[in-house]
Swiss-Prot record:
It is found in: Host cytoplasm. Keywords: Activation of host autophagy by virus, Coiled coil, Early protein, Host cytoplasm, Host-virus interaction. GO terms for biological process: symbiont-mediated activation of host autophagy. Residues 39-75 form a coiled coil. Residues 103-131 are annotated as: Disordered. Residues 116-129 have a biased composition (Polar residues). Induction: Expressed in the early phase of the viral replicative cycle. Induces host endoplasmic reticulum stress and consequently activates autophagy and NF-kappa-B signaling pathway. In turn, may induce autophagy-mediated STING1 degradation and innate immune evasion. Belongs to the asfivirus K205R family. GO terms for cellular component: host cell cytoplasm. It comes from African swine fever virus (isolate Pig/Kenya/KEN-50/1950). This is Uncharacterized protein K205R.
Length: 209
């Protein structure tokens, strides 16, 4: 027969063992949760790194697009400036540069400027008068003394400086355009197709001065 004191200690040891088992199980659960948390945290960091990389890629693409846009705008500005410069040369000197594909043989000189820095040119006249060949005076301080609308609408001017072949091409290519829109389209076409590389280089050098 077990004595009461011995039974007490046995019961105490049994209770301690059970408590230790419970603590061990709790520790195991905590370690599992820790492992799960670490895995989740690693996954989160991977997703964060991926997101950061995607943001950087988007930023690089945006900067590339911005640089391309600036380059296109600069190239367009040079081309339009070169077209205007060529028109200025034609209008002031009355003699266009030799064309790359078609020589403008029909071009003739405009009257030279007078001492008052004025020049007489032929235009279609005002829409109300209906007169063609009316002589008007314009100040040469503005080198483009032909306005854009006059260039786009003046048949005598076009016939004076463009060969029939070029006029036919422009009329066919840009029949659906009028006014300033047609001027820009025709100018860009002439720049791309009628200017030699040497002429383009010369005009670009002029624009830098």
């Amino acid at each position: 027969m077990v004595e009461p004191r011995e039974q007490f200690f046995q019961d105490l040891l049994s209770a301690v063992d059970k408590q230790m088992d419970t603590v061990k199980n709790d520790i195991i659960d905590v370690m599992k949760e820790k492992t799960s948390f670490l895995v989740s945290f690693e996954n989160f960091m991977e997703r964060y790194d991926t997101m950061e990389k995607n943001i950087q890629d988007l930023q690089n693409k945006y900067e590339e697009m911005a640089n391309n846009l600036v380059a296109v705008m600069a190239d367009t500005k040079i081309q339009l400036g070169a077209i205007i410069a060529q028109l200025e040369i034609i209008m002031v000197n009355g003699t266009p540069l030799p064309a790359k594909k078609t020589t403008m043989k029909d071009a003739t000189s405009l009257p030279p400027p007078n001492p008052n820095n004025e020049q007489s040119v032929f235009t279609n006249g005002s829409p109300t008068s209906g007169k063609i060949g009316e002589t008007v005076k314009k100040n040469l301080t503005n080198a483009m003394f032909f306005t854009r609308s006059e260039w786009a609408s003046s048949e005598p001017f076009r016939q004076k400086f463009l060969t029939p072949e070029i006029q036919a091409i422009l009329d066919e290519q840009f029949a659906n355009k009028t006014g300033i829109e047609r001027l820009h389209a025709e100018g860009l076409y002439m720049w791309r197709t009628q200017f030699s590389d040497e002429q383009k280089k010369m005009v670009k050098e002029m624009m830098k001065k």
